[in-house]
């Protein structure tokens, strides 16, 4: 009994940039879940791709979307950078669209509305004399 192994030739890949030392090239690590047929458990399988980054806009830690090239540029570079999905350090909450760090939102002082104390007291209809 033989197990049929199929290789995945993905045209679009999402991964994390792990190196940008080469000129106009980003080193991207992609993690996939692979089923072990004997244990029936999924394990992480990592693969490293080299992608052409013409504008050198990637930094280490970015989450990027890669597109397969119809013809390889070099022996190792077979993908190109299509989009930077998330810049490192600039995480955006998908529901609210605000920047966040962990479970707290990062609000700049420009975004905060400042209202005078007298206006807040008028809204509450409080008086200082009783």
From Swiss-Prot:
It comes from the Eukaryota. The keyword rRNA-binding applies. The keyword Glycoprotein does not apply. GO terms for biological process: translation. Pfam families: Ribosomal_S17 (PF00366). InterPro entries: NA-bd_OB-fold, Ribosomal_uS17, Ribosomal_uS17m_metazoa. Keywords: Mitochondrion, Ribonucleoprotein, Ribosomal protein, RNA-binding, rRNA-binding. Component of the mitochondrial ribosome small subunit (28S) which comprises a 12S rRNA and about 30 distinct proteins. Belongs to the universal ribosomal protein uS17 family. This is Small ribosomal subunit protein uS17m. It comes from Bos taurus. The lineage of its organism: Eukaryota, Metazoa, Chordata, Craniata, Vertebrata.
